[in-house]
Swiss-Prot record:
Binds 1 Fe(2+) ion per subunit. It comes from Fervidobacterium nodosum (strain ATCC 35602 / DSM 5306 / Rt17-B1). It catalyses: L-threonylcarbamoyladenylate + adenosine(37) in tRNA = N(6)-L-threonylcarbamoyladenosine(37) in tRNA + AMP + H(+). This is tRNA N6-adenosine threonylcarbamoyltransferase. It holds the Pfam family TsaD. Keywords: Acyltransferase, Cytoplasm, Iron, Metal-binding, Transferase, tRNA processing.
């Protein structure tokens, strides 16, 4: 079975063809360079770029794979959560194709799509397992049960971890997006140089809070400046490495606690922050107790291959949302549908 995936939830335009667990092609157009000068994603610009790029990318996909759309068994498109304008572009395009070529169409939860990115690398992966979802928009701990029911065990009560990376990077004068910049510069820093607080780390629940860490970094920069450092000679690698270490320690403490409390050994990572090299390094130290599933780097960020793979399950079982669904930008509304 071949499924076409379409992803336009934020600032990546992506289309893919997936046959079972094999990615035939996965094309991604990133808008990072466009949004970089604004220090973050501008929703209206993102939607306009999707509108411009999606038809071009789709034509390239068909041309490169030499697979006629008549051979495609179904279409999967990101339904939400995400930016409403961006989502509308993808959903409208998918509906047009489904109507024109009489193909089944399913709307996919973007969060679940990230989970399914692991199935592209680990086709034998099966529930139950715990998910650590770490991205610019969401930080979640999920429990996926054998019947594929998903329960939210924990979430960030303020900033998502990817958002915290961006904000701390801005404080340190680094570029956008902040996660890769902090990851890179931290390799030259001491992760124990600064004793930043670890918010909610030892609370009994599985929730996260990262806004206080951003404030702690800001106060440390002010303290260093008052003590004689100029803005040009601040110990940026040490500050970045120390802040990154706190975020990773909190993430791993919470997700392993959730796994132990639920008597589960399998932990699945998902989302853009799963590409962080320090996170991957520290996971290796836990590999004797837990089985970690980490998506390949190319499937950590938003992509249509993961959407196609998630849709394949539903289309194979005969599901078809048809044309009677709309994008759902809100996370909690999306998780309840």
């Amino acid at each position: 079975m071949i499924v076409l995936g379409i992803e336009t939830s934020c600032d990546e335009t992506s289309v893919a063809l997936v046959e079972d667990n094999t990615v035939i092609a996965n094309l991604v157009y990133s808008q990072i360079q466009i949004h970089k000068k604004f220090g973050g994603v501008v929703p209206e610009i993102a939607a306009r770029e999707h509108l411009k790029r999606l038809p071009i990318l789709f034509s390239e996909l068909i041309s490169q794979t030499n697979i006629n759309i008549e051979r495609i068994d179904g279409i999967a498109v990101t339904k939400g959560p995400g930016l409403i304008g961006a989502l509308l572009v993808g959903v409208s395009f998918a509906k047009g194709l489904a109507l024109r070529y009489k193909k089944p169409l399913v709307g996919i939860n973007h969060i679940i799509g990230h989970v399914y990115s692991n199935y592209l690398a680990y086709p034998d992966l099966k529930p139950p397992y715990i998910v650590l979802m770490v991205s610019g928009g969401h930080t979640l701990i999920l429990k996926v049960e054998e019947n594929n029911n998903v329960t939210i065990l924990g979430r960030s009560v303020d900033d998502a971890v990817g958002e915290a990376f961006d904000k701390i990077a801005r404080l340190l004068g680094l570029g956008y997006p902040g996660g890769p910049e902090i990851d890179k510069i931290s390799k030259n820093g001491n992760p124990n140089a600064f004793n930043f607080p670890k918010p909610k780390m030892y609370d009994p629940d599985y929730n996260f809070s990262f806004s206080g860490l951003k404030t702690a970094v800001l106060y440390e920069i002010k303290r260093l400046t008052k003590s004689g450092y100029s803005e040009n000679n601040l110990p940026i690698p040490d500050l970045a490495a120390s802040a990154q270490e706190v975020m990773i320690d909190v993430l791993l403490h919470k997700v392993t606690k959730a796994a132990r409390d639920n008597n589960l050994k399998n932990i699945v990572l998902a989302g853009g922050v799963a590409a962080n090299s320090r996170l991957r390094e520290k996971i290796r130290a836990l590999s004797e107790e837990f089985n970690f599933y980490i998506p390949p780097l190319e499937y950590c960020s938003d992509n249509a291959a993961m959407i196609a793979r998630a849709g394949l399950e539903r289309i194979k079982s005969g599901e078809n949302d048809g044309l009677n669904f709309e994008p759902v930008p809100n996370f909690f509304e999306m998780m309840s549908t």
